[in-house]
């Protein structure tokens, strides 16, 4: 049975389809589409030489979501909210709420001090989800250290209501991320399932889903292609507009909705290669965002 439901999160009313139950009593979770500062990595200044004179701001990212009729925005570490004053954070929060946009936060380098600061920011901005990349420059905590830091943060997240989502990101395997969450064993600590990052540990999306889907609090969707390198020797993994690459997106979304224990956001990211000029890069980035949003909307 499929119904339309309305619900409110952090003052934002969202309407979307929900499949309540399948034959055999399988519960299917809700998901909703979000944009990220990594939907627009070049506009946010990720490239060392192709950098706009003015980088995209949080308000401009919210405006992009409005233009594309997307109700959720996730700020990642390429748009770090700890670089803004309290007054600026309040303005971003109020602007998003006034325009019906739910916000999610993101950080990397999970030291105890940085985690505490980002939980504070999330609480101040009425943000329900903090996505976390544990590692940073020169900082690679062990599984035991990650587990300890998260466990120590439990009183704070219980007080604020913020959910922590640890993202699979390059170094650890999907099984290790699942182990961390199971050891912490708290309903406000889960996983951000990234569709592509675990290629760095030679894990397929099927392996990632097997371990991580039950703990999913957010899905990072980025499609990819594999092609010959420019020299013709070796292979390169590159980004693809959603629905045109190798990621079996409909099957992944279906699996997550059946196996996640809670509702989750589906946040669009991009690994697009840069073009010959900044102008061409930004134009293609914009086109990919529009086409990817249209494709993913057709699946939700």
Residue ranges and their predicted role:
Residues 19, 88-191, 200:
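Active-site acidic/histidine proton-transfer and metal-coordination neighborhood
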Residues 38-40, 78-80, 106-110, 135-137, ...:
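Active-site beta-loop-alpha junctions enriched in small/polar residues
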Residues 42-46, 138-140, 275-279:
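A short acidic, helix-capping loop that chelates divalent metal ions and anchors anionic groups
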Residues 152, 156-246:
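Acidic/histidine-rich catalytic cores of soluble enzymes
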Residues 238-240, 268-278:
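Active-site clefts of carbohydrate-active enzymes
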